[in-house]
């Protein structure tokens, strides 16, 4: 490496011949843009949501890649440090599931962990540079796993297991003040009916969902307790944040109104709220929030023609 070559040259010339005064050079401070936060700030934000950071090997078991990442052609190591750790990871989720298993073997009753690191995927468009290798994409990801009670042991509330919506709220907090859209989706590691794709400005930035029942059983997790909930997000999407812009306070007092809509069962939350916000209200509508859902009782006749 460069430093070793410099050391050898100095040894030949003689250390006693080096000038005693430090070299002078102009120094210019590098100021991070206000609309960008660093990875350490992101780590602190995840830790503030009650997750503990873990650091795992970048080489993992081939089984994890096939089952939890759907990657049947992972990048193989020519000289792995151990026979099971034979491929490079393309997802952080396998390592977090293994961390959960490690803690459960030591009788942990509540586990909330995360990792921020690089994953490795084949990409023919990547060229060799100072930080890249030809054909290999190395994006930064952050992933988290929550299992067990929502709150630590305490007396003020009944114990409740963490669920999809708890972790979804954590993802929303990490992306705030930007508002994400959650679209029902499928992921190799996650429950097909309890998984969502996270989108920002129409672009997919990650996934959140419960661990698939098949993998919960396959990785020997407790059967009588809830499934762990996981998320994995692109780090660049989390580092960007809009700069607050001043808006004058309205001279007129805000008015709240309730509105009832009749929609089909297939209509989701985002479709309902999106249609309201897209309506031509002349700038009078600032926000909309869904607070109640009513469904007729099973067997009821429903709405009559004159009741709509």
Identify the function of each model-found stretch.
Residues 101-103, 121-122, 213, 295:
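Short beta-turn/strand-loop junction motif enriched in small, turn-promoting residues
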Residues 31, 35, 85, 89, ...:
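Generic alpha-helical structural element
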Residues 14, 50, 117, 148, ...:
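Glycine-centered flexibility sites
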Residues 12-28, 73-78, 119-158, 248-258, ...:
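Residues forming anionic-ligand binding surfaces in small-molecule and nucleic-acid pockets
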Residues 44, 48, 84-85, 103-107, ...:
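A general structural signal for short secondary-structure junctions and capping/turn motifs
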Residues 56, 63, 137-138, 143, ...:
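A carboxyl-terminal module marker
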Residues 1-111, 116:
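Extended, well-folded interaction surfaces typified by the phenylalanyl-tRNA synthetase beta subunit core
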Residues 69-81, 85, 133, 206-217, ...:
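Active-site loop ensemble at the mouth of alpha/beta enzyme cores that anchors a bound cofactor
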């Amino acid at each position: 490496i460069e430093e070793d070559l410099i050391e050898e040259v100095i040894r030949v010339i003689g250390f006693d011949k080096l000038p005693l005064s430090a070299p002078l050079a102009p120094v210019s401070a590098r100021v991070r843009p206000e609309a960008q936060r660093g990875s350490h700030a992101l780590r602190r934000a995840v830790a503030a949501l009650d997750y503990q950071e873990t650091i795992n090997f970048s080489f993992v078991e081939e089984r994890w890649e096939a089952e939890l990442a759907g990657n049947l052609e992972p990048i193989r190591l020519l000289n792995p440090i151990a026979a099971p750790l034979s491929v490079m990871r393309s997802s952080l989720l396998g390592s977090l599931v293994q961390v959960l298993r490690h803690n459960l073997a030591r009788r942990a009753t509540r586990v909330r962990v995360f990792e921020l690191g690089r994953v490795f995927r084949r990409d023919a468009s990547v060229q060799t540079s100072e930080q890249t290798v030809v054909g290999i994409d190395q994006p930064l990801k952050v992933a988290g796993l929550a299992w067990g009670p929502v709150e630590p042991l305490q007396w003020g509330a009944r114990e409740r297991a963490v669920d999809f919506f708890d972790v979804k709220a954590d993802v929303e907090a990490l992306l705030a003040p930007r508002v994400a859209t959650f679209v029902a989706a499928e992921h190799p590691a996650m429950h097909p009916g309890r998984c969502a794709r996270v989108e920002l400005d129409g672009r997919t930035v990650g996934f959140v969902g419960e661990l698939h029942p098949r993998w919960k059983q396959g990785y020997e997790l407790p059967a009588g307790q809830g499934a762990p909930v996981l998320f994995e997000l692109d780090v660049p999407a989390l580092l960007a944040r809009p700069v607050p812009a001043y808006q004058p306070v309205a001279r007129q007092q805000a008015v709240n109104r309730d509105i009832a809509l009749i929609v089909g069962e297939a209509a989701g939350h985002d479709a309902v709220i999106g249609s309201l916000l897209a309506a031509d209200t002349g700038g009078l509508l600032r926000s909309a929030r869904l607070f109640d859902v009513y469904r007729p009782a099973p067997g009821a006749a429903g709405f009559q023609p004159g009741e709509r």
